[in-house]
A protein has these predicted regions:
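N-proximal low-complexity "stem/linker" segments adjacent to membrane-targeting elements
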Residues: 1-25
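A conserved acidic beta->alpha catalytic loop
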Residues: 23, 38-47, 87
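Glycine-rich, basic loop-to-helix element that forms the pyrophosphate-binding segment
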Residues: 62-78, 99
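Conserved nucleotide-sugar donor-binding catalytic segment
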Residues: 76, 115, 129, 133-222
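Short aromatic/hydrophobic "clamp" motif used to bind/position activated sugar donors
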Residues: 83
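The conserved acidic donor/metal-binding loop of glycosyltransferases
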Residues: 87-91, 116
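Conserved donor NDP-sugar-binding/catalytic core segment of glycosyltransferases
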Residues: 95-127
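C-terminal subregions of glycosyltransferases and related glycan-biosynthesis enzymes
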Residues: 203-321
């Protein structure tokens, strides 16, 4: 049996899948299987996979069940001791699996090991931004405020965690299914972090019509579920958790194609009502500057300012190296 099962859910992702698969097949660690779950795609994914000669790649086709359902299918078919997830448009550094396996082999008590993640745009170009989190060991206090496992593509999970904590909740959508899963694992197992960007997360402009209320409700479900099983001594974190969730939500209208800065301001207001102390946080200051830029320059000007800042960040990073 392979040591690692790599689960890739795919829904009409053929534009990015070849590069994603290549980043897996060129891993320095070779003892793995790839379980690609074709989640009801209509873009010829099956035909493309059939042309891959590598016997480690296995295809499962199902009717569309969403990201959680596809991941759960992958988990059910996985035979590895460790399970790593990779979204169909993200990329891995060649040493990603090797370093994570070594971490789990050397630390038998660890349930999940994650890495830093670098942000790329839709065309695969670096934005210059790297998400860095340092929390490890008992991380529940940190993860209830912020999903330190920034992307599902950075996580490698010990198989027994799913046997103990259950699998992904198919009733949750709107990008919170990861957060819910990691919270449940964090309540039972320590985490480790590899402090280097071994994953490239592809950022897309979201569609114009997003149901912000549904997204907010998904956050609410996760928070209430987490605190329902948390010891009373941790309940003081609930207000801060809601506040941080609403700061996170406030970015979503600014990242959509039809940017809605008024909705962003509404989420920001709610965040500070839940937790006034967040007013002085770096995240709230960044959000305030982004909203101000939108008000000053409009939607097109805001996008140009972001592009200018990303370019400046890339040049600074190249100079620093």
């Amino acid at each position: 049996m392979p040591k690692v099962s790599v689960v890739i859910p795919a829904y009409n992702s053929l534009k990015y899948l070849p590069a994603t698969m290549e980043s897996v097949l060129r891993q320095t660690f070779n003892d793995f299987e790839v379980i690609l779950v074709n989640d009801g795609s209509s873009d010829n994914t099956e035909n493309w996979v059939s042309q891959i000669a590598d016997p480690r790649v296995k295809l499962i086709t199902q009717e569309n069940q969403g990201l959680s359902g596809a991941r759960n299918t992958g988990i059910a078919h996985a035979s590895g001791k460790y399970i790593a997830f990779l979204d169909a448009d993200d990329l891995w550094e060649p040493t990603k699996l090797e370093k994570q396996v070594l971490c789990l082999e050397e630390n038998s008590e660890i349930g999940l090991v994650y890495t830093w993640v670098a942000l790329i745009d839709e065309n695969g170009n670096s934005t210059g931004r790297v998400f860095k989190n340092y929390a490890e060991n008992d991380v529940w206090h940190q993860i209830i405020e912020h999903n330190i496992v920034e992307s599902g593509s950075v996580a490698m999970v010990r198989r027994q965690c799913f046997e103990t904590c259950g699998v992904f909740d198919r009733n949750l959508r709107s990008f919170v299914e990861d957060w819910d899963m990691w919270l449940r694992i964090a309540s039972r197992y320590p985490f480790k972090v590899l402090k280097e960007p071994l994953v490239y997360y592809r950022q897309h402009s979201t569609s114009a019509s997003r149901n912000w209320e549904a997204m907010e409700q998904s956050f609410r479900i996760v928070i209430e579920k987490a605190f329902a099983s948390a010891p009373p001594k941790l309940h003081y974190l609930k207000g801060r958790s809601y506040g941080c969730a609403h700061l996170c939500l406030a970015w979503k209208p600014l990242q959509s194609r039809n940017k809605d800065y008024k909705k962003a301001m509404d989420f920001q207001r709610q965040a500070l009502e839940y937790c006034p102390q967040l007013g002085f946080s770096k995240e709230n200051i960044r959000l305030s500057l982004a909203i101000a830029a939108f008000e000053w320059f409009g939607s097109d000007g805001y996008s140009r300012v972001l592009k200018l800042l990303y370019g400046l960040r890339r040049r600074i990073q190249r100079f620093a190296r």
